[in-house]
Amino acid sequence: MLNTGLRKGLALSPITHLLKRCSSVTDNVHRVNYCYNYHTVPNLSQRNLLPLFSPEALDIAWDQHQRQVVKELNDRVKGTELEDSSVFNIIFQTAALPEHAATFQFASQAYNNHFFFQSLIGKRAADAKKNSKYEANAAINKAVNENFGSKENLLSKIHELASNSFGACWLWIVIDDYNRLNLLRTFQAGSPYLWTRWQSNDPHLISSVPDYSARPRKYAHVPILNLCLWNHAYYKDYGLLNRSRYIDTWFDCIDWSVIEERLTNSLV
């Protein structure tokens, strides 16, 4: 049985570093020192993500995009009560506050994008892991087979959902209300953790409007894998007409050992 609550220290908890930077301001009479917290873009453990991302595309999809998103987030939380909060907590603190709508979007996008890149590995390394006797990934393989039939069927369903998606969005594999793996789509910077911020209206994914008041859990769903369908992720290497090839290549570059760890960390 899967447990959709998050444990302390789980890999799905805050993902961007919260550092402290000290600065000073000087006038003719006084010297004023002040410190404030700010989020930074962490280094990726995997930089060789060929053939999914060329170095130039990786610079756009990770370095430039993440720097922009984190800068916008820092600009909005500086000097506020949110300044000392993690990115993960900012998502929850701002989700229901219209005056912090932009802050939510930037925090959620920073989280989503890092979550995406944490699950990737170059195809050569992925193939080596696949052929290794030490790379069993028994839990995720069993869960995928039970809920989707096979990884091939899962990929087919992802293609189907992507072909029916318009605009910037994220596709997620999540542990759902019934402790099953399921697909979820969130538009723009929507978060799978919050029922009110799925930002998804696909009737194939959500059959009815959830009764939020009846939900006992803190988190709506626990994501274990996501796919970025923002144009900046695939335009450089694939153009606008080859998104299906981008999805196939992404599937070949998933580090299933990471997904295995995310899943097993949610097991009772």
Swiss-Prot record:
Q: Which GO cellular component terms, listed alphabetically, does the Swiss-Prot or TrEMBL entry include?
A: cytoplasm; mitochondrial small ribosomal subunit
Entry's Gene Ontology molecular function annotations: metal ion binding; structural constituent of ribosome; superoxide dismutase activity
List the InterPro entries hit by this protein, alphabetically.
Mn/Fe_SOD_C, Mn/Fe_SOD_N_sf, SOD_C_sf
Q: Which UniProt keywords apply?
A: Mitochondrion, Ribonucleoprotein, Ribosomal protein, Transit peptide
Q: Which Pfam families match?
A: Sod_Fe_C
Keyword set includes Ribosomal protein: yes
- The source's superkingdom equals Eukaryota
Q: Where in the cell is it found?
A: Mitochondrion
Name a biological process GO annotation.
mitochondrial translation
Q: Any idea which residues the transit peptide spans?
A: 1-23
Family recorded in the similarity comment? Belongs to the mitochondrion-specific ribosomal protein mS43 family.
Job description of the protein: Component of the mitochondrial ribosome (mitoribosome), a dedicated translation machinery responsible for the synthesis of mitochondrial genome-encoded proteins, including at least some of the essential transmembrane subunits of the mitochondrial respiratory chain. The mitoribosomes are attached to the mitochondrial inner membrane and translation products are cotranslationally integrated into the membrane.
Q: How does it assemble?
A: Component of the mitochondrial small ribosomal subunit (mt-SSU). Mature yeast 74S mitochondrial ribosomes consist of a small (37S) and a large (54S) subunit. The 37S small subunit contains a 15S ribosomal RNA (15S mt-rRNA) and at least 32 different proteins. The 54S large subunit contains a 21S rRNA (21S mt-rRNA) and at least 45 different proteins. mS43 forms a dimer with mS42, building a large protuberance adjacent to the mRNA channel exit in the mt-SSU body.
Q: What is this protein called?
A: Small ribosomal subunit protein mS43
User: Which lineage is the organism of this entry classified under, starting from the top rank?
Assistant: Eukaryota, Fungi, Dikarya, Ascomycota, Taphrinomycotina
